[in-house]
Regions:
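Extended hydrophobic/aromatic segments used for targeting, binding, or gating
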Residues: 61-64, 69-75, 80-88, 94, ...
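Core segments of cupin and vicinal oxygen chelate
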Residues: 24-70, 107-110, 114-117, 125-136, ...
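Aromatic/basic-lined ligand-recognition segments
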Residues: 73-79, 134-170, 183
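Short, small-residue-biased leader/transition segments that mark boundaries at the very start
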Residues: 1-3
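Residues forming anionic-ligand binding surfaces in small-molecule and nucleic-acid pockets
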Residues: 7-15
């Protein structure tokens, strides 16, 4: 391998940074919203109230004025939960996960899986069985989604034939408590609202398996 090859290694198909998720102490969400809003002119575009099997969280999704930088802010609903666990392990507030975007999520996920990346537990079989009811008219390959546990969300194929689909999958923690999200957007600009609870419960299950609760 020549020096030039080492300087420009082959990629795995991720082309842009989609968003960063910021975990904060309970009660600090408004403070951090003011920070991003006052200094960088961010605005709120989504608010989530998520309840898992044992714990819950609030999430306030922000975007920059140009719309290209997005930062959801998360805080726990109670005194215990995955955000509290993160804050203890991270020893403070910080980035929970980094989302990177692909043009072909199936190929990219196959590649990084072969390289040893491990993923959060996938959803049950019924999730895929009912995917056409949730995301109308989608023609995503169910077998390839199930292979690694890729999630699907969005409005599907809407009036006029426009496609609004989001595909996403999450790694297990790789840098302390930090993990990665791998995402492909097909006309959908959301955060996978329909999958948010599935992700929350997957993290919850992994933490329970480690004895964190």
């Amino acid at each position: 391998m020549c020096i030039r090859d080492r300087a420009h290694p082959a990629g795995v198909g991720f082309h842009y940074l989609d968003h960063l998720t910021h975990n904060v102490f309970k009660g600090n969400m408004d403070k951090w919203f003011a920070f991003y809003s006052d200094l960088f002119n961010f605005r709120e575009i989504r608010f989530f109230d998520i309840q898992g099997k044992h714990t819950g969280l609030f999430s306030r999704a922000l975007t920059s004025a140009c719309g290209r930088i997005r930062i959801p802010i998360n805080e726990d609903r109670g005194e215990t939960g995955q955000i509290v666990n993160y804050l203890k392990k991270y020893k403070g507030e910080g980035i929970q996960h980094i989302a990177v975007g692909a043009h072909d999520i199936y190929s990219s996920v196959d590649t990084i899986s072969d390289l040893g990346v491990k993923f959060m537990p996938g959803p049950p079989e019924v999730y895929y069985t009912m995917s056409h009811d949730r995301v109308v008219g989608h023609d995503e390959p169910i077998d390839r989604m199930k292979k690694h546990g890729i999630l699907i969300d969005g409005e599907g194929v809407v009036d006029g034939g426009e496609t609004k689909i989001l595909l996403q999958i999450f790694s297990k923690t790789v840098i302390g408590p930090i993990f990665f999200e791998f995402i492909q957007r097909k006309g959908d600009d959301g955060f996978g609202e329909g999958n948010f609870k599935a992700l929350f419960e997957s993290i919850e299950a992994e933490e329970m398996s480690r004895g964190d609760y």
